[in-house]
Every structure is written in structure tokens, then in C-alpha cells.
């Protein structure tokens, strides 16, 4: 789903436009004048795929999918109108919510659901429709991760799926264990120590990507995974699992050094492509560029941990006529259909939400190098010992940013790790109060 394999998911999703929102019960109130007068109604769908085909081919693929749905329903009483937005879709959402409304249909592009929209009951609960139409497998991870208090307010048709990428040639030169051999955290740190000894090579770039290691350590234990299953609390922050994860990541980052700390994954993409670093923390969407160099291979994190989140996606207003709501739900069904989900995998280059799609089988039969590598990367994630959601998806952007800042700062040689762990815990406790 990304414009550039070097982009992190956060940057990539921002390029598709950031937004948020959701909540509520079905209602036919607040109909427009045209709806009341019998004129053809318009169902507006806001999305961020505004880019030209030459700038980002994926955007054209997505627009074609939307246009196909519009044509298939052109003879109905409701016109489906996709609206590409070159800007921040959050502004559209915020303005609507401020006036007690919500866009007819909007793609959250991975962003969290608006609590204000939930509280005002502005967004439709999608779970009844999903259950009635047996779409549980089609929506996949969304059914579990996006279900809050028995309701599902948003469904993302493609998943934010993270493993990592490594240069097998560098690992061979270093005699280091490859990711498939990282049974413990020590296996990982020892491999990184080995690749640092190769002339002209550093292990990995940190900064924003460092939070993937914290995410991983929590995912390696049952207690840590339990922390990732709910809101961040004072007790969670003070827990042994949380503090130990901070301590272990900070210690490793300090060994890795401050020279390659700071920024997002984009800051280290060029070095990885040129063989100057051994590991690149990025998602499965990177397959397109990785396929150009056979030395660059996908892997998952220590202890067989992978990271995958549904995040926000198709979100529907609860304040529409029954006809508009019906078409909106048909659009949800269409975007999570096997036919469309196969295109999401093969043409968009993303991990489809639909559990019915056998990406491994499709990849093995394909002659396309990118599809083959993408299938390999996604299959590794699906077969991981543990799959955990992202920190930002579970605990929000503020906590996500605070942890990244703390981890980045810990890379400096003069930082006292124990003091940094305590200071980070204090900052996080102040954020949740």
C-alpha cells in the first residue's frame, strides 16, 4: 500500500491522507433536501489516493477499484461518488464531527477512530452487517483488533504488517545468525554485534524504527502480550515486563550507537539499499524495491514475533438514509471481497485483510518477482509464533512518539539507562493521566 518501500507505514499512510472517526447506531435522520425531495442521492466517499499514476501507480489501482464499484451501481437510486483528497482528511472529519455530522464514507488510512465521533454516535457499527453476511474471514484481523465493546466501527481492507529486511550477504560475511534463527533476544543482539564487525557496515538505523524492537520484546512474553491487549495504565507502565523491555532495547540501542539514531526509516533506506547497513526495519510493502536485489530478504523479529495491525479503514456515517447506508455497506463488502483482496495483494502490494486469500499459493504460482517476495514476507508473518499490534494502534500516537523519543535519546553514550527507564516511565504516566 506504499508509494515507496523506504517509507514507514506512518509516512505512507500520511501520504494517503490521515484521518480518524467512528461510532454509533444506524439512523436515517439528517437526510439532505435532495433525499427528501426524491432526487438521486449521492454517497460521497473520501479517500487519499489522489496521486497521478506516474507518481504512484498504486493510487490509480485503488481509484480503478472505486470507479468499478461506482459503474456497477450507476443505475441505482444512489450515486457512489469517490472523492480523492490532496490534503489532510482529518480536517474534513474534524469539521464534520464538530457540527455533529460525519462524512458519508471515509477511508481512515490506518488512523485511529475518533472518540468524539463514537461519543456522538455518528458512525455506524459494522459488526451486525459483517456477521449477517459471514464476512468475518474477509475482514480478518479487523474483527478482533477493531472490535470495541462488541462493536466494529471501522474496517481496513489492507493491513499494516511489519517484519524486517536483512542483507544476507552481510550476514554471511559476519557469520551471524539470520532472523529465522533468532529464538531469543540474545540471538538478535549477538547477530548485530557480529555484523558491526564487517568493514563499512553498521547494524541498523534507529529513531522511529526503534519502537519495533520495544514492540517485539513485549510480544515475546505472555505478560507482555497481555499489556498490548488493552489500554496503557499506571500499573502496566510500572510492570516488570514494561520496564525490562525498555531497559533491554535502550541497552541495545546504546551499543548500536548514536551516529545512526534519529529520524524515521526513510533516513536509513539509502544506506540499506547500498549495502552499508545489515538490517532495515520496514514492512512487507517494501517488497517492490527489495526484489531488485536478491541479497535483501524478509525476516521476522526475535522469538518469532511479527507486528500486524488493522487500524482504521472504511468508516460509515450512521446519519444517512437507508438507501445510502445500504450502498455504503455494499461497498464495504466489495472492498473485502476475494476478488478485490486478490488485487490488493498482487497490484497494490499490501497484506490483504481477507484470510481467504492464500498469498503463499498465489506467490508460488506467480512469475512476478515482487509478488513472490511479498508472498514470502507475508507468509512469514502469518506463520509467526506471535503476532502483536503496533504500539500506536493500541496506545495512541502520543505514547508512540514519547517512547520513540526516549529510545532515540538512550542511544547517546553518556545516557544512564536506569535513569532513562525511570524518566520514560514518568513521562508516560503523565501522558495517560
Identify the meaning behind each predicted range.
Residues 213, 295-316, 366:
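Periplasmic-binding protein-like
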Residues 190-194, 232-261:
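Glycine-centered hinge/linker elements that transmit conformational signals in sensory
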Amino acid at each position: 500500500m506504499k508509494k515507496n518501500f523506504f517509507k514507514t507505514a506512518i509516512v505512507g499512510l500520511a501520504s494517503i491522507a490521515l484521518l480518524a472517526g467512528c461510532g454509533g447506531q444506524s439512523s436515517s435522520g439528517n437526510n439532505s433536501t435532495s433525499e427528501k425531495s426524491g432526487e438521486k442521492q449521492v454517497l460521497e466517499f473520501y479517500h487519499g489516493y489522489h496521486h497521478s499514476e506516474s507518481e504512484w501507480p498504486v493510487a490509480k489501482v485503488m481509484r480503478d477499484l472505486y470507479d468499478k464499484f461506482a459503474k456497477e451501481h450507476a443505475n441505482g437510486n444512489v450515486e457512489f461518488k469517490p472523492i480523492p483528497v490532496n490534503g489532510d482528511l482529518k480536517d474534513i472529519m474534524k469539521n464534520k464531527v464538530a457540527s455533529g455530522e460525519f462524512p458519508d464514507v471515509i477511508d481512515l488510512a490506518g488512523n485511529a477512530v475518533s472518540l468524539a465521533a463514537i461519543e456522538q454516535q455518528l458512525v455506524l457499527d459494522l459488526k451486525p452487517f459483517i456477521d449477517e453476511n459471514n464476512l468475518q474471514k474477509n475482514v480478518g484481523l479487523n474483527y478482533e483488533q477493531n472490535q470495541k465493546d462488541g462493536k466494529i466501527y471501522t474496517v481496513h481492507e489492507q493491513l499494516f504488517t511489519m517484519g524486517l529486511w536483512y542483507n544476507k550477504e552481510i550476514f554471511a560475511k559476519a557469520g551471524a545468525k539470520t532472523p529465522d534463527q533468532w529464538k531469543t533476544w540474545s540471538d538478535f543482539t549477538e547477530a548485530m554485534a557480529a555484523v558491526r564487525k564487517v568493514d563499512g557496515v553498521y547494524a541498523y538505523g534507529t529513531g522511529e524504527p526503534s519502537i519495533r524492537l520495544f514492540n517485539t520484546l513485549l510480544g515475546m512474553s505472555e505478560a507482555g502480550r497481555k499489556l498490548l491487549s488493552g489500554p496503557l495504565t499506571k500499573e502496566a507502565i510500572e510492570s516488570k515486563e514494561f520496564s525490562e523491555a525498555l531497559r533491554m532495547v535502550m541497552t541495545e540501542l546504546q551499543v548500536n550507537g548514536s551516529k545512526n539514531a534519529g529520524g524515521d526509516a526513510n533516513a536509513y533506506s539509502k544506506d540499506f539499499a547500498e549495502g552499508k547497513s545489515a538490517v532495515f526495519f520496514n514492512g512487507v510493502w517494501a517488497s517492490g524495491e527489495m526484489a531488485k536485489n536478491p541479497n535483501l530478504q524478509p525476516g521476522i523479529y526475535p522469538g518469532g514475533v511479527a507486528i500486524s495491525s488493522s487500524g482504521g479503514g472504511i468508516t460509515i456515517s450512521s446519519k444517512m438514509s437507508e438507501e445510502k447506508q445500504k450502498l455504503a455497506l455494499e461497498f464495504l463488502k466489495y472492498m473485502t471481497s476475494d476478488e478485490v483482496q486478490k488485487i490488493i495483494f498482487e497490484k497494490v502490494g499490501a497484506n490483504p485483510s481477507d484470510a481467504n486469500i492464500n498469498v503463499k499459493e498465489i506467490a508460488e504460482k506467480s512469475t512476478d518477482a515482487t509478488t513472490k517476495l511479498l508472498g514470502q514476507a507475508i507468509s512469514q508473518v502469518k506463520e509467526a509464533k506471535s503476532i502483536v499490534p503496533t504500539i500506536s494502534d493500541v496506545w495512541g500516537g502520543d505514547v508512540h512518539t514519547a517512547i520513540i523519543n526516549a529510545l532515540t535519546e538512550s542511544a547517546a553514550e553518556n545516557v544512564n539507562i536506569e535513569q532513562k527507564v525511570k524518566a520514560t516511565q514518568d513521562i508516560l504516566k503523565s501522558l495517560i493521566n
